[in-house]
């Protein structure tokens, strides 16, 4: 822990913590300070001027990062018949119906994302208490309840990131790995910021995007100039 503290302190000395940086400069600082012995995730935190306790101020959506997430995502699909075959051909890791429900109820959740065809939702709905807290419950708003199984599987494995505002009005999401090039990370950051701006709810009043910060798993946060990022 002492070494982590020293490394964090040293990283903070490489940039001005009060300066608002462009996305490109923020990425450069964060990437240069990602020196852990593993490939750190680069994370974006956005403070929004919303109160998610009100339904008309909820912010939720999905963004297909142009350069992917750098993660290997295992996908489970609830489907039957031709759609189950389609899911398998698309590369889904687990495909099933009642058998998949029993697997999940038994605690065997060896996947990261769940997709379902609409006709499977009465079955999937019985798993709400298990999948909901894990953020894995299929939802048509983010494209995981769909007849377009192939696209949903490809998006999930190819870089789709779901975002949802937390109680404090903050969205946290990974935008890649420290091993990505600066250009790839910056492009991913811009794509996610743009998606969140487009997801502005009707009930949002006043300043919508209040603060943006970028960090690596073990590194300090670097502040981003919101006015430049939102208009970029």
Curated annotation (Swiss-Prot):
Annotated keywords: Repressor, Ribonucleoprotein, Ribosomal protein, RNA-binding, rRNA-binding, Translation regulation, tRNA-binding
GO BP field: regulation of translation; translation
InterPro entries referenced in this protein's UniProt entry, alphabetically: Ribosom_uL1_bac-type, Ribosomal_uL1, Ribosomal_uL1-like, Ribosomal_uL1/biogenesis, Ribosomal_uL1_3-a/b-sand, Ribosomal_uL1_CS
Membrane spanning residue stretches: none
One GO location term (cellular component): cytosolic large ribosomal subunit
GO function terms (MF aspect): rRNA binding; structural constituent of ribosome; tRNA binding
Subunit structure: Part of the 50S ribosomal subunit.
Function text: Binds directly to 23S rRNA. The L1 stalk is quite mobile in the ribosome, and is involved in E site tRNA release.
Similarity-based family: Belongs to the universal ribosomal protein uL1 family.
PANTHER family named in the record: 54S RIBOSOMAL PROTEIN L1, MITOCHONDRIAL, LARGE RIBOSOMAL SUBUNIT PROTEIN UL1M
HAMAP family from the UniProt entry: Ribosomal_uL1_B (MF_01318_B)
Protein name listed in UniProt: Large ribosomal subunit protein uL1
Classification lineage: Bacteria, Pseudomonadati, Pseudomonadota, Alphaproteobacteria, Maricaulales
């Amino acid at each position: 822990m002492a070494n982590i503290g020293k490394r964090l302190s040293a990283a903070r000395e490489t940039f001005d913590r009060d300066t608002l940086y462009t996305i490109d400069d923020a990425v450069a600082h964060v990437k240069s300070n990602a020196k852990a012995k593993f490939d750190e995730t680069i994370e974006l935190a956005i403070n929004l001027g919303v109160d998610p306790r009100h339904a008309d101020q909820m912010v939720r959506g999905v963004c297909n990062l142009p350069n992917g997430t750098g993660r290997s995502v295992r996908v489970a699909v609830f489907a039957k018949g031709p759609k189950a075959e389609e899911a398998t051909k698309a590369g889904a890791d687990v495909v099933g119906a009642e058998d998949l429900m029993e697997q999940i109820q038994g605690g065997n959740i060896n996947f990261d994302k769940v997709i379902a065809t609409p006709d499977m939702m009465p079955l999937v709905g019985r798993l709400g208490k298990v999948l909901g807290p894990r953020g894995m419950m299929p939802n048509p708003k983010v494209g995981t309840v769909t007849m377009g199984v192939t696209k949903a599987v490809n998006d999930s494995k190819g870089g789709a990131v779901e975002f949802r505002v937390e109680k404090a009005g903050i969205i946290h999401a990974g935008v890649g790995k420290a091993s990505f090039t600066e250009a790839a990370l910056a492009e991913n950051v811009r794509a996610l910021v743009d998606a969140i701006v487009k997801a502005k709810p009707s009930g949002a009043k006043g300043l919508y995007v209040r603060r943006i910060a970028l960090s690596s798993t073990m590194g300090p946060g670097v502040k981003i100039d919101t006015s430049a990022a939102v208009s970029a």
